[in-house]
Every structure is written in C-alpha cells, then in structure tokens.
Amino acid sequence: MKTLVWVEHDGSTVKDPTLPVITAAALLGEVHLIVAGKGVDAVAAEAAKIAGVDKVHVADDAAFEHVLPENVAPLIVALMADHDAFLAPATAIGKNIAPRVAALLDVMQISEILSVDGPDTFTRPTYAGNAIATVQTSDAKKVITVRGTAFAKAEREGGSGTIEAVTSTGDAGLATFVSAEIAKSERPELTSAKIIVSGGRALQNAENFHTIIEPLADKLGAGVGASRAAVDAGYVPNDYQVGQTGKIVAPEVYFAIGISGAIQHLAGMKDSKVIIAINKDEDAPIFQVADIGLVGDLFKLVPELTEKL
C-alpha cells in the first residue's frame, strides 16, 4: 500500500505538523511525500532524510508558491493514480486541501484520525471528543486528515528516501493570491509549544488578560492560548483560541486560568500531559480533567505564582 503525505513547509524547512502524519502513514505501508512550492529543493532534501520516508515527489512551480488549494488539489489527484491513500495534517492548510481532493476523487474523507487499526479502519473523535468512532472505508482511494497530537513525531534524521520531480498541473485559474498578513510573536506557536498558558472569560477584559496571563507565560517561555469565550469577548485575537473550533494542542503542561471547561474547550486540550487549573468555582468541569487544581481568586493566585517563579 502506497500512501502520499502532504508536506507543510515554510519554503526552507519541513514544519512539525508533517512529522506525526508520516508516523501514521508508515502504519499503512510505503510512505511517499509530496513537496509543492517554488524553489523547494532544500525542503525536498530535508524531507528525504526523515525516518520512514521511501520517496519524495517534488512539484516545483510558481502555481504552488502560496499553497492555493485550488491549484494543489488537482496535483494531488493526479499523483493518486499511483497511490492508495492521501494523508494530510489536520491544520488549516490540510483541512482546506483534503476535502477538495476527496471531492475530486469522489470518495469519503476521514477527518482527524487518532489511530490506524488496519489498512481501511481508523478511529476518530466525535461528540467533541467525548466518544471515539471506529470508521471503516470501502473506498479504493483513501483521503485522511491526521490529528497530530495522537501520533509520535517521525525523526528528522535516519531516512534515505529518493527524490523525484513530478509534472506540474499548473495554475487552475480559480484563485489568485493577493496578500498574507502573518502574525509575529516571540512566544512559541500554540501547536508546538511545550507549555501553554490559557485564559478564559473570568479575566473580565483584555487588559486583565494581558497583565495576568502574559507575564506568567513569559516567565515560563510558554505559548498563550484562550477559550472561545475570551476570544468572542474580544480579549485576544482568534488565533489564540484553543478548542474544538480552534487549535488542538497537547503540550507538556497546560495552564487553564479562569476557564470553566466547556466541552468544546476540553476537546482541544485534554491530551495535555499535565493540566493545571485555576478557578474560583470548585465545581467547574475543568477540575474533572485537571492534574492539579487551585480553587481561588485568579487575580491573587496568578500574580503570586508568577512572582515565585
């Protein structure tokens, strides 16, 4: 069985979300990668060294420079003639490409798998992660997104895959890249941070969020997250959101400060290794998943904790 894996990259290096997908793909059989972009020889060379990789397909074309899914999907469909499955990270990019590929192939997409139980059988979360569904597909071609927190990252060294240039499908003419606004931060990106400090609506306003949450995060070298309630209230931008409709994270340590623990939020962080919750409501659902719980006034507890570090 040959599996094609979408490689996320920044033009020079392979991004971390790709690595767990390679681990998942290896459970199905032979692992091939697709690197698409403009001037991506360095990315392809790095990808070929990843443990478990058998082959790297390279599509070097200006049409793929900005990863417009309208251009990328036909490329992947063309490559699927020689592959049995297509796997992509369950990221914003992966979730944009995979459904288009599935539609063009006229097959079912299986989203955010947690395990590979067989060549056609997988598990995935449902009901906001409160239940795990086992899904079996009879489709000849499989299109799957992978939840990165469910699989170990493939080692970046140890592989010796071959590199092969593929024919570009070119510009589909359906979309045009205009511009991109990239938020820059010195803090770790949420999906790769080892420690995350998240705040909820109990912080009351944006000023409190910044003065309470950010100093603690800076002391710990942590990423900063937020509940949907905090985002909806305008405390922080949408890219801070952790949860079912935000980012799925699994850091070594997760601080949930002033977060009650709605099902949608728990779905995005419950796989964290250690969860520390601070909330004045001792009956808050967050304490049901917390390893360490502090019941009290966050406006007193968090500054004291920050000072002690």
Question: Language-model segments: what does each one mean?
Answer:
Residues 1-309:
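N-terminal glycine-rich FAD/FM-binding segment characteristic of electron-transfer flavoproteins
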